[in-house]
Amino acid sequence: MPFVPVETPKCPACGKSVYAAEERVAGGYKFHKTCFKCSMCNKALDSTNCTEHEKELFCKNCHGRKYGPKGYGFGGGAGCLSTDTGAHLNRE
């Protein structure tokens, strides 16, 4: 029986093999510890501040800036808050 090497997952950031001792997982992809950083600001990430979009890693702030809602009325602060009490949901 011929020797068949085990396939190791490739890091989406650098394309090299990722071994179990150095892997970080986000969005179902395995990254190297050194590649596990925001693709916009290069901030080191962990499981609490990491977001993945199409194999790219982002911190939550940069992800919101790049893919969040844009235009007039978004990010307006406390003036945009609603005082809806949900009365329309209590139909009896």
Curated annotation (Swiss-Prot):
InterPro entries: Znf_LIM (IPR001781). It is found in: Cytoplasm; Nucleus. Gene3D superfamilies: Cysteine Rich Protein (2.10.110.10). Residues 11-62 form the LIM zinc-binding domain. GO terms for cellular component: nucleus; Z disc. Keywords: Cytoplasm, Developmental protein, Differentiation, LIM domain, Metal-binding, Myogenesis, Nucleus, Repeat, Zinc. GO terms for biological process: cell differentiation; muscle organ development; muscle tissue development. A motif (Nuclear localization signal) lies at residues 65-70. Pfam families: LIM. In the embryo, expression is restricted to the somatic, visceral, and pharyngeal muscles. Within the somatic musculature, MLP60 is distributed throughout the muscle fibers. There is no expression in cardiac mesoderm or in fat body. GO terms for molecular function: metal ion binding. Positive regulator of myogenesis. PANTHER family: MUSCLE LIM PROTEIN MLP84B, RHO-GTPASE-ACTIVATING PROTEIN LRG1. This is Muscle LIM protein 1. It comes from Drosophila melanogaster (Fruit fly). The gene is Mlp60A.
